[in-house]
Amino acid sequence: MSEHGADLRFDSPEKEIKHWKSKVADMQDALRETESSLQDFVESSKELEQEMEKELSASNKTISDLKRRNEQLSGDLEDWKSKYSRALSEHNATLTTLQKELGQLRESVDIYKAKLRDTELTNDELENAERMVASSLADMEGKYNKTIEKTALLEEELIEKTRLDEENQRLKDELREMTEEMTILRDLVTRSRAISRADTMASSTYDDSTAPRSEQSFDSSPIKPSSAARATERPSSRQALSSPVTNRVPISRRLGAMGHNRRLSRDVRAAEAPSLAAVLDDSPTATTTSAAPTRSSTLSRRDPLAATPYHHGASTSHGLTSSPSARAQLRASVRAAARIGGAVSVSSAPRSTNLSANGGAAGSKRMMAEMISKMKALESRINSAKDLSRVVGPGDESAIPRPSSRMATIGSPSANGHNSIHMPTSTPRAPRASMDGNRTIGSSIPVPSRVRRPSSRMSERGTPPMPSLGLPRAQTPSSLHARGSSRADGPSPLPLHEFMDHDPASTLPHAARYAAAQASVAKRRTSMSGSGMSHSASHGSLAKVRSGSTLPRSTTPSTVAAPRVTQSSMTYYGAEASMSKRTPLSTRLASSHRNASSARGSINGPPSSWKTSAMPAQTLSRSRSSSLGSETETF
């Protein structure tokens, strides 16, 4: 105001007072306004303070509530923190445990992988070993079959050798006895000729007075040859053994007759022996007293000496027999005749002048004819025994008697419940050709028929299964051993549990074993005709059969060589062989490899190739006998 007052200049003091009064009035108005404003402000501030107190009390209450809530939440937080820490520790422990277990499982997986790898390697090695064992088994089976056949051949040869040794010893004994009998008979013939000569001279001297009767007696007496002629005509023991009569029947025919007689004596067991029609020559009595029939080309029971009553009995008693009783009767009759002849010669010496010429001449002729016939029979037997090894050739039919077939096909029960048994009760006999080939002799030995027989599986199974054939991993020896997929509509393998305890000799067909009989007989004859009893030829032929099919399929040897085969059985199995067809082993192995490729490495059991498939409705059952028992093989 001072500044305003200093700046203000009044004209008069009244104006100055007036001015200052107006100023005071303005200031008082401003004061009143300010006081009213203050009063309003105080009132508003009181209201505001009340409201603020209310708000403060509410805020304090809220704060207390929030604090209490905060404390509660803090406690919950601590609880959750402890729970979290505890869960975290548990999680860490669990994680550690799981990590340890994971490490262990990884180690176990690695170990199992290594074991699986080792197992697979071992499995591969075992399968390789199994294939090697299968091939070795097939090889050993082939060797076993070959050994069986060789053993059968050796047994047959040993039996034949034993029989021939016995025959040789018997013939030696008979030769010695017959030599002694020939010596006795020769002395007897010499004495009888001297006695008959003395009787003839005495009768001619006595009958000189009656010329017609003396001529008749002289004609009826035997002609007296000179000493040189008698020495020429009288056969010595060496001539009887080495110089047979020229008009004798061929030795092959006599050997055939001997074999036929032996077979008749063995099979028929008849007491009647065949005659000596093809062996003995015509005697002087037979040519002078009877019209003897001519000899036929075949052996018959009629002999030229049977025309007279005397030789009818001699033809059967002195025949060429092989039974011991007949030989003993022959020797007894010869000794009895020798004793009777000696007694007659001794007793007729003092009475030679009293005997009539006709009776003495006829008796001496009969005695000489009988002795000559006996000597000729003995000579023929000795010559036949000496020429036995020379006549029997490798290509000839054997004249040696063989044992009859004792085989019987005994099989397992058939479809109708009965056993299929084939016994050779009425075995047909094929005619056996003689050695000289101009006639046939009915034989009692069963001859194998010439029909085509089923081939064996030895030529197919001789090659062992090698890895080059594509043998599957799951292939087993049973599928190699008994697979016959091409033999019928379905395969018929051998079960697995029967493989190791199964006889390999019985796996082959029965007819194939029969087929080995003919081959074994042929090889036996070949080995007999060679150097002694060697069987190198048969072993070579068996090796050929093992290595390849050089022999025809009808003569392929099998596991077991049967001794003999009847013709009816061979015809039956030959008819069965035409109903089955065979395929090589390599083809069957290739097909089995293709079929069993899906079963490689299977762990659920054996592959499908091991399992026996359903057999077709129409099957042919053929029984076979083995060393382990009877089994049935189906086609």
From Swiss-Prot:
Residues 14-192 form a coiled coil. GO terms for molecular function: microtubule binding. One of its GO terms (biological process) is chromosome segregation. Pfam families: NUDE_C. The keyword Cytoplasm applies. Residues 280-299, 516-541, 620-635 have a biased composition (Low complexity). GO terms for cellular component: cytoplasm; kinesin complex; kinetochore; microtubule. Residues 43-56 have a biased composition (Basic and acidic residues). Keywords: Coiled coil, Cytoplasm, Cytoskeleton, Microtubule, Transport. The keyword Transport applies. Residues 35-63, 200-267, 279-328, 389-504, 516-635 are annotated as: Disordered. InterPro entries: NUDE, NUDE_dom. It is found in: Cytoplasm, Cytoskeleton. Belongs to the nudE family. Required for nuclear migration. Self-associates. Interacts with PAC1. This is Nuclear distribution protein nudE homolog 1. It comes from Mycosarcoma maydis. The gene is NDE1.
